[in-house]
Amino acid sequence: MKQIIFTDLDGTLLDSVTYSYEKSLAGINRLKQNDIPIIFCSAKTRAEQELYRRKMKVFHPFIVENGGAILLPSNYFPFSFGYRRIVDELLVIELGIPYNEVKKLVDKIKEEGGFHFRGFGDMSAEEVAKESGLDIESAKLAKQREYSETV
């Protein structure tokens, strides 16, 4: 029987305070040795997940922005399937709507509902870093939203 692991990143493979994955490496390496695919499924953006995929050397499909899209390496499966576009040699199956549409809707809800909040799209990378505890480079990656808005 083929096994596969779907996992979140924040607080699972990544320490929820330091964002370190050091404590997860032994398990990740054991899964790799046993040819068990590790599928990241996270609220993180494609840009954020690509950084961790490179660092951890995990090159399986991954799910971004809480299901906004599934990205697969172009030659991952030996069969064809429907996908919307190709980005950096990744096939993109889009399940969500584009960020600009999400942002318009969030802004409309905010305005018409009289709500007072800011999303990542309303903040600079410096503000995102300050509010989230991310370092500035991570905040820049977190702002590269394609399917969701963090408020």
Language-model region placement:
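Asp-based phosphoryl-transfer active-site loop
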Residues: 2-18
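Conserved acidic, metal-coordinating active-site core of Asp-based
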Residues: 109-151
